């Protein structure tokens, strides 16, 4: 199982966006990068064309390396990064990600 998946709430632990939180929109496994909502915004200059009617400067998220992200346990009161252990959900008998400290489910589950 991957440590960080689409829909997970993460905290940035390094770089210019340190301590900010966001939701993972997309993960690129081979490149080890992820796009996080509202983080690492870049400006792209686009020409107007048939598909993209408006041209000009568009702001969008750029990928950030997975080593700069950490999962958050949103049920715990503190916002420290979470170390993950794997267990099975008794209801569905599937693998799930659990917080080591609080034993809560983590991620977008």
From Swiss-Prot:
One of its GO terms (cellular component) is ribonucleoprotein complex. The keyword rRNA-binding applies. GO terms for biological process: translation. Gene3D superfamilies: 2.30.30.30. The keyword RNA-binding applies. PROSITE patterns: RIBOSOMAL_L24. SMART domains: KOW. One of two assembly initiator proteins, it binds directly to the 5'-end of the 23S rRNA, where it nucleates assembly of the 50S subunit. Belongs to the universal ribosomal protein uL24 family. Part of the 50S ribosomal subunit. This is Large ribosomal subunit protein uL24. It comes from Mycoplasmoides gallisepticum (strain R(low / passage 15 / clone 2)) (Mycoplasma gallisepticum). The lineage of its organism: Bacteria, Bacillati, Mycoplasmatota, Mycoplasmoidales, Mycoplasmoidaceae. The gene is rplX.
């Amino acid at each position: 199982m991957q440590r960080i998946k689409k829909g997970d709430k993460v905290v940035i632990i390094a770089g210019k966006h340190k301590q900010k939180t966001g939701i993972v929109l997309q993960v690129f496994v081979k490149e080890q990068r992820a796009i996080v909502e509202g983080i690492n915004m870049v400006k792209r200059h686009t020409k107007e064309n048939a598909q993209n009617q408006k041209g000009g400067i568009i702001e969008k998220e750029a990928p950030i390396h997975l080593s700069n992200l950490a999962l958050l346990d949103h049920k715990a009161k503190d916002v420290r990064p979470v170390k993950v252990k794997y267990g099975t959900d008794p209801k569905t008998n599937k693998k799930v990600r659990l917080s080591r400290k609080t034993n809560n489910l983590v991620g977008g589950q």
